[in-house]
């Protein structure tokens, strides 16, 4: 089941650094305004071809060295709080 059309013209996030994360981030750019790919390290486990596809997509922004600390919202997601693993600073997407 694909829920991508529910996110049409929205800014969304994908968490992870493997092939599945790269594939979903790339696929979701068909619907979303932008996709932020959040990964806890600065290196990825994804295969080179999957990583290159994601890196060559202008709609995908990479946020490395960050972890998710909270999902904001009651009945729907309104934001995603992430923490920089180097500085400890928190940001809301």
Q: What annotation goes with each model-predicted range?
A:
Residues 1-31:
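Glycine-rich dinucleotide-binding loop and its adjacent helix/turn
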Residues 30-93:
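A Rossmann-like FAD-binding core segment of flavoenzymes
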């Amino acid at each position: 089941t694909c829920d991508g059309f529910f996110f049409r013209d929205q800014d969304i996030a994908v968490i992870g650094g493997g092939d599945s994360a790269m594939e979903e981030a790339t696929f979701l750019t068909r619907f979303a305004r932008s996709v932020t790919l959040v990964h806890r390290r600065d290196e990825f486990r994804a295969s080179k071809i999957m990583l290159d596809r994601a890196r060559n997509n202008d709609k995908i922004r990479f946020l490395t060295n960050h972890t998710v600390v909270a999902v904001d919202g009651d009945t729907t997601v309104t934001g995603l709080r992430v923490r920089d693993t180097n500085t400890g600073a928190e940001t809301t997407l």
